A protein has these predicted regions:
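Short, solvent-exposed loop/turn segments at secondary-structure junctions
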Residues: 3-7, 73-74, 111-115, 128, ...
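Secretory-pathway luminal glycosyltransferase catalytic domains
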Residues: 7-139, 240-296
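Catalytic binding pocket for nucleotide-activated donors in carbohydrate/polymer assembly enzymes
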Residues: 189, 194-264, 268
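Donor-binding and catalytic core of enzymes assembling or modifying cell-surface/extracellular glycoconjugates
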Residues: 125, 134-222
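Hydrophobic beta-strand segments of well-ordered beta-sheets in folded domains
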Residues: 1, 66, 104-106, 142-144, ...
């Protein structure tokens, strides 16, 4: 996050970036440990592997003058400084807004754009409707609005729900100051939700970036955060501790996970290609059918 407004003119976060560091100031580089599994869930996971890594304890032992590289989203890296983070990531008063902070309003942070072309990644309509049903259990008069980078896709996926794409500071503060949040598997919402002073409930997709296809693995394990509730494909909610315990059991007992750490070749790779192609065909075929139905419905009106 660069903390800029929509026109990249002025930082909206009152964020001290530290003293300027020059290349010669770094005497070593530490790359956070990676872990990937290779599956036919999508072309990316077959070719490059799906990133599933959790925390790397080595991050806590780097020396001064080290350039730290990695995903670096694990809760353990920043949770001890949560209250300080709220100060470090404080929004300047002139950019802050509580216009959409209401006791009966839930904000959906929907990620579209390039996500929408990946069936393993783009969250299905069922995730959002199941999550909204959970929020309705809290208040029967709960209303919903969408904050998104892709208003067109939001209208197609969830017609009838108001959708907005504000300048980046507007999207950020709307998420940060919401009472109730349903977020996507995008890191954009993580820090505003994690540092929020107003939020009462956050629902996120179980298995994060592989909510649609996972048989128990997380993409990645770094995205399990205390205080978030994770919605499974079964429509049920799981707290962070339950997710961690389930993951530990999965890692210890699941043969699929143990056998997919190496990129496949030969027949195994070709079978993966067939699986991925079938997933894309079904996904885009379904989108085409739904688009045709919308057009026909519009003509009938």
């Amino acid at each position: 996050l660069n903390g800029l407004t929509g026109n990249n003119s002025e930082p909206f976060l009152d964020l001290w970036m530290g003293e300027e560091a020059k290349p010669e100031d770094f005497t070593r580089v530490y790359e956070e440990k990676e872990e990937r599994i290779y599956t036919g869930a999508c072309r990316h996971d077959l070719e490059h592997g799906c990133y599933v890594a959790g925390e790397d304890r080595g991050v806590f032992n780097v020396e001064d003058g080290t350039l730290l590289m990695g995903n670096l989203q694990a809760e353990s890296y920043f949770a001890p400084n949560r209250e300080q983070l709220k100060e470090w990531l404080k929004v300047k008063p002139e950019f802050d807004s509580y216009e959409y902070t209401r006791d009966n309003l839930c904000v959906l942070n929907l990620r579209g754009g390039e996500y929408a072309s990946e069936p393993a990644l783009f969250l299905r309509k069922k995730y959002w409707t199941d999550a909204m049903a959970q929020m309705k259990k809290i208040r029967s008069d709960m209303e919903f609005m969408i904050v998104t980078d892709d208003v067109t896709m939001a209208h197609k996926l969830l017609p009838g729900i108001p959708a907005y794409h504000f300048p980046v500071h507007g999207d950020y503060v709307t998420v940060k100051n919401a009472r109730y949040l349903i977020i996507s598997n995008s890191s954009f919402a993580c820090f505003p939700a994690f540092t929020s002073e107003t939020v009462q409930k956050v629902i996120a997709p179980k298995y994060w970036a592989r909510h649609n296809v996972s048989n128990g693995y997380w993409a990645s394990e770094q995205n399990i955060y205390t205080g978030f509730e994770y919605l499974g494909r079964d429509g049920k909610l799981y707290d962070a501790q339950a997710c961690r315990e389930e993951l530990e059991t999965y890692r210890g007992q699941n043969e699929f996970f143990a056998k997919h750490h190496e990129k496949p070749d030969g027949m195994a790779y070709r079978l993966g290609e067939i699986q991925a192609k079938a997933a894309y065909t079904a996904y885009f075929g379904g989108r085409a059918v739904r688009s045709l139905k919308r057009r026909l419905t519009g003509q009938q009106k």
